[in-house]
C-alpha cells in the first residue's frame, strides 16, 4: 500500500482522497522548497508557474490538516540543496500550521512516516538523543532554526557534535 504522498500539488481538489488518507494513515509530504527552487533558479516557465502551484500547496496543507492527515516536513532529494530543512518548517508555518505543528511535522511525524518512530522523532527514554538547541524560541519564530549563528548545541545519538553553550557560560 501507499505510506505517503510526496508533493501532492492538487490534493486540495479532492476532499474524498484527503479523508481516505486520514483514515488509512497516509502521510502528506508537500515539499514546499521545490517551489522556492523553481522560483529562484528554474526556467522562466517554471518561475511563472511556481506561484500558482504554491497556492495549491497551501490549500492542500490546510485541507489535509482539517481532514486529519499528518503533514510531514520533507525536501526533494536531488531537487534542492540539502541542509536547508528548516526552511521547509517555515513554509509549513506560512501555509497555516502552528510552529509546534511544523516542529512535529519535522520530527515525530517525519520519523513515523519513515518507520523510525521507535528510534527517533521525539525525546523519550530508549530513543536516540538527537537534539538541536537554539538561542531563541521556535514556537514564537520558526525562522530561528535557519540561523546557523543561533544553533548552540547539536547532539546526534547522544554524541555532542557542536557545543557553543559552554563558550557562552564560560565568558
How should each PLM-predicted stretch be described?
Residues 19, 103-104, 143:
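Generic structural signal for individual residues within well-ordered alpha-helical segments
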Residues 1-4, 68, 128, 150:
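Short loop/turn motifs at secondary-structure junctions
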Residues 53-137:
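His/Asp/Glu-enriched, well-ordered alpha-helical/loop segment
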Residues 1, 19-21, 43-44, 86-89, ...:
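Short, glycine/charged-enriched secondary-structure capping and boundary segments
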Residues 112, 125-170:
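C-terminal cap of metal-dependent C-N hydrolases
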Residues 1-58, 77, 96-98, 111-114, ...:
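Active-site core of metal-dependent hydrolases
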Residues 12, 20-22, 64-66, 124, ...:
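Extracellular/periplasmic catalytic domains that process cell-envelope and extracellular macromolecules
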Amino acid at each position: 500500500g501507499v505510506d505517503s504522498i510526496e508533493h501532492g500539488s492538487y490534493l486540495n481538489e479532492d476532499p474524498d482522497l484527503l479523508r481516505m488518507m486520514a483514515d488509512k494513515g497516509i502521510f502528506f509530504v508537500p515539499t514546499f522548497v521545490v517551489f522556492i527552487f523553481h522560483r529562484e533558479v528554474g526556467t522562466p516557465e517554471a518561475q511563472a508557474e511556481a506561484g500558482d502551484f504554491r497556492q495549491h500547496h497551501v490549500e492542500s496543507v490546510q485541507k489535509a490538516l482539517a481532514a486529519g492527515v499528518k503533514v510531514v516536513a520533507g525536501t526533494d532529494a536531488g531537487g534542492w540543496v540539502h541542509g536547508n530543512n528548516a526552511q521547509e518548517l517555515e513554509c509549513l508555518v506560512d501555509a497555516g500550521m502552528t510552529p509546534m505543528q511544523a516542529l512535529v511535522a519535522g520530527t515525530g511525524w517525519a520519523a513515523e512516516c519513515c518507520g523510525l518512530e521507535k528510534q527517533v522523532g521525539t525525546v523519550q527514554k530508549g530513543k536516540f538523543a538527537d537534539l538541536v538547541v537554539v538561542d531563541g524560541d521556535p514556537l514564537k519564530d520558526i525562522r530561528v532554526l535557519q540561523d546557523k549563528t543561533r544553533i548552540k548545541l547539536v547532539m546526534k545519538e547522544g554524541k555532542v557534535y557542536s557545543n557553543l553553550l559552554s563558550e557562552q557560560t564560560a565568558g
